[in-house]
Amino acid sequence: MSKYSYKIATLAEGVEGLTNVETLGTCDKHVAPRGLDEFEAFSVYRTSASGLEYGDGYPHTVWHFDAIQEPQLTALLAYLGAETNQSAQVYITTRIADRTYKNYRAVMHRPKASEREPGNRTKYTVWHNVDVRFTMLEAQ
């Protein structure tokens, strides 16, 4: 049974097809992202002429994996479609500021290869500090 409720689905699968991230790939140890600290309700914050700050734009979140095995990462990145795609629209379930989970339609961005750190080589390669960004979140 999954410990967290981070989920993902393609546009074709819809919200009904959301799959728990902890079940992706065939590996020894599945992990969930640490997404709570990275949820922002707005894209940018601006200061009005009166000096008050307000939020503008879509919410966004980052799923940060301290360590993730290659099969789980490959299965997660498959939601981008082709290996050359840098982003794609998907459905996700992610944790928000009040510690509840909510469904969104979002744009998923491929993590930069230069930002991933290869870790120990056991049965599977383990990648460290992998960030998967989701922008333009629209509540479903």
Per-region residue spans from a language model:
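Extracellular/virion structural assembly segments
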Residues: 1-140
